[in-house]
Amino acid sequence: MKIFFFLALLALVVSATFAQYAESDGSYEEVEGSHDRCQQHQMKLDSCREYVAERCTTMRDFPITWPWKWWKGGCEELRNECCQLLGQMPSECRCDAIWRSIQRELGGFFGTQQGLIGKRLKIAKSLPTQSTWALSAISPNSMVSHIAGKSSILRALPVDVLANAYRISRQEARNLKNNRGQESGVFTPKFTQTSFQPYPEGEDESSLINKASE
């Protein structure tokens, strides 16, 4: 969510940045001296951000932690100071500043943490090329998914477990692991339903009670 906020803010800054350019002979020329001024503001913002990263990270992000009471109040104040520095920047300098912040968010502070997108990419790259169990583990609805459904789960189970769980033979369990076409035979009842007759023919409730009492 934070990244999307940065991107939206970046779009607004880009639109405002073009207003700071002067058009000459069909091309845009940057306002004189803005580059040096932006570098000075960027150095201040980098120092502020690095200080926040050093003092206000949690154990999950950085090996150093500080007392909770100080962390809760002090870090919010430090972040507000960084936001004020960003707000004081000229509009033509904010574009690069926000883009650098996005890069830090994706890569983490000082390389100690991976951003959310980086973590997901790392997990995706570490998955094997062919693994039905991996597909089942990351599927949001594995029991009904055609790609990672019962087939992938059953293939991950030993033959003996399937045979005992569904009370089938080892050969049937082996066929079930390797062939989805056999699944319907497991999940359908093996008994046939018969019509229920409450009393035998020619007898009623009183006759049955008399037989039971004898």
Swiss-Prot record:
Which keywords has UniProt assigned to this entry? Seed storage protein, Signal, Storage protein
Q: Is Signal among the key words of this record?
A: yes
Under CDD domains, the record lists: AAI_SS
Annotated region (Disordered) at: 180-214
An annotated Gene Ontology molecular function? nutrient reservoir activity
Which residues constitute the signal peptide according to the record? 1-28
* Highest taxon in the source lineage: Eukaryota
Under SMART domains, the record lists: AAI
Q: Give the function comment from the record.
A: Seed storage protein.
The protein depicted here goes by the name: Avenin
